[in-house]
Each structure stands twice: as structure tokens, then as C-alpha cells.
Amino acid sequence: MSDTLTNTGRYQATFAKLKAEGRGAFVPFVTLGDPSPELSLKIIDTLVQNGADALELGFPFSDPLADGPVIQGANLRSLAAGTTPTACFELLAQVRAKYPELPIGLLLYANLVFANGIDAFYAKAQQAGVDSVLIADVPVEESAPFSEAAKAHGIAPIFIAPPNADSETLALVSASGEGYTYLLSRAGVTGTDTKAGVPVEEILSKLKTFNAPPPLLGFGIAEPAQVSAAIKAGAAGAISGSAVVKIIETHQHDEAKLLATLGDFTRAMKAAT
């Protein structure tokens, strides 16, 4: 795994810096263009300026299989605002220009990658300054065409380590992934209703044995105590999606309140790392 070939440098630098500080990463997820492209940029600014260590960003998609109603709502709002993949790449380029050292990951579905050809998608992502891509509906066993295109464009392929995975799958995830490992705290759809509760220590110790990229715990991370628990269990940090998007949903018509609430939430989650 040569750093000259892949763009995992920003992740490595971020994780190394956090490790030196004895902290973990707080990584929020939002859908690009939710509730509008203009406000989406202000939301991203608010997240970064209040302590987000990296970003996980989605492209709006009308049929998100793995997502609960909160993130589906984000997709629909973004699409209603006219957010296209081209608009998403433009937003990404703006974020990258503003935050040259921030790790930026995409979390999306295979259809969006297939739409204009796999290679063309990764070429655009590279041009926009993207560090990693996680394709939610492509398991590691079927990921070769995506991984090859990603690596050809210096982008880290990210894989999900499911809570019910056997050692063979975890070994494959560890060997195939770069940047970070997305560790699911439970199987199912995203959301904050069921609190993250699967004992992850066992999976974390296996990932460590297999020398996996740093694991970030996601799914159901909605409060600071869960961030602390994830890091205490051995995760390199935590990803929070539905809880962040819920704030956008609640205050979508009141920009000042939305950004203030989001800032408070981000600071509280980061403080728990």
C-alpha cells in the first residue's frame, strides 16, 4: 500500500495528529445539496469550523436502500433543490479549496458511480479533491472494478465491516480498504432510533489483528457518550449521520437556528473524542 499511489495521505495525517493528542475523530455525514446547494456549503463550514475532523458526504439518490427515513428525507430535499451529480462535484471542489488538509469521503450508491462510467466518476472525484469513496451497496467481494478505478485515481476505497462479519470477511475488508474502515455498530438501516449497542470490541480487535485501516464506528451515533464509548472500545473515531441530518430537517426553514444548533452539536460530539 504505497502512499504515492493513493490519496490516503490526509486520513493518515489526521489520524496521526489525533493519536498524538490522545483523541479520536468526529466525522459528520450530510447529503450534498440538503436543503439547498447554498445552505449545504454553510452547513459544511459550520461542521468543520466547530471541530469535525473529516467529512462524509452523500450524493442525493432517490432510492437509498440502506438509509432510514431521516437520510431519505435529506436525499429528497436535495433532489427537490435541483442538486445534480455535477453540482455535487462543484460543491466538493469548493470545500476542498477552502480546507486543503481536511479528509473528504463520499458515501453513495453504485448506480451513481455507474451512471457515466466507473472510471469517469473516480476521475471527477479526484479532480474535485475527494480522498475516499464508500459504495454502500457493493460488498467487498464484488468491489474489484470500483477499487481498481479508485486506486487508479489516487482515491481510497472504503469498506464496511458489518457487526455479523466472519473473520474471512474482516480479513478481506482489512486488506482491501484504505484510508479508514467503516465499522457498523449494528446491521440494518441508518438512523438514531436504535442506539448503537453491539459489542464492537471483538470486531475491533480482529480488525487490529488484520492490520485494517483505522476503524470509524457508524450507525446510530447520536450523542457524545456514544462517541466516547466507541473510542474507548478501540475505534479511531465515530461517524454521525442521521443525528446531524435530523438537525437540518428540523431547522431547514430557519438558517440561523440550523447553523447554531449544528455548531453546538458538533462541538459537543467533538468534545467527547
From Swiss-Prot:
GO molecular function: tryptophan synthase activity
Pfam families: Trp_syntA
Stored PROSITE patterns: TRP_SYNTHASE_ALPHA
Top-rank taxon, per record: Bacteria
Keyword set, alphabetical order: Amino-acid biosynthesis, Aromatic amino acid biosynthesis, Lyase, Tryptophan biosynthesis
Disulfide linkage: none
Pathway noted in the entry: Amino-acid biosynthesis; L-tryptophan biosynthesis; L-tryptophan from chorismate: step 5/5
Active-site residues, as the UniProt record annotates them: E56 (proton acceptor), D67 (proton acceptor)
Top class in the EC scheme: lyase
Catalytic activity: (1S,2R)-1-C-(indol-3-yl)glycerol 3-phosphate + L-serine = D-glyceraldehyde 3-phosphate + L-tryptophan + H2O
TM regions (residue ranges): none
GO cellular component: cytosol
Family: Belongs to the TrpA family.
Matches recorded under NCBIfam families: trpA
Its job: The alpha subunit is responsible for the aldol cleavage of indoleglycerol phosphate to indole and glyceraldehyde 3-phosphate.
Matching HAMAP family: Trp_synth_alpha (MF_00131)
Subunit structure: Tetramer of two alpha and two beta chains.
Name of this protein: Tryptophan synthase alpha chain
Organismal lineage: Bacteria, Pseudomonadati, Pseudomonadota, Gammaproteobacteria, Alteromonadales
